[in-house]
A protein has these predicted regions:
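Flexible coil/loop and intrinsically disordered segments
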Residues: 1-104
């Protein structure tokens, strides 16, 4: 049996709906240019987990992030408002870079 992992965009390239309640920030030009492919917007998941989540609402994704520390980190970061936005992506990006610089 082979276990396959995927790198998931927490904010997907396309969402199933563009309503404000989908749990993501507005996808403006700044978001596409600086946040969509940002390290802080990536998450490691099993292949089957990634496929099951697709481009769905953030709340559904968030509730499924229960296995790895990095998944639990996203849950903790969104406890108050349960929205994945530019500020949280930037915070997570900085935290990952700081950690990498510390161990290198």
């Amino acid at each position: 049996m082979t276990l396959t992992n995927h790198i998931l965009n927490i904010s997907p390239p396309q969402t199933e709906n563009q309503e404000a309640d989908n749990g993501y920030c507005q996808y403006d030009e700044d978001f596409y240019n600086h946040y969509l492919e940002c390290l802080g917007n990536y998450l490691l998941l099993s292949g089957s987990h990634n496929i099951s989540l697709s481009n769905g609402r953030f709340q559904i994704k968030r509730d499924s992030y229960t296995h790895l520390q990095q998944q639990l980190e996203v849950q903790r970061m969104t406890e108050q408002d349960q929205v994945w936005d530019k500020d949280k992506i930037r915070q997570r990006h900085t935290k990952i870079i700081d950690y990498l610089m510390e161990i290198l």
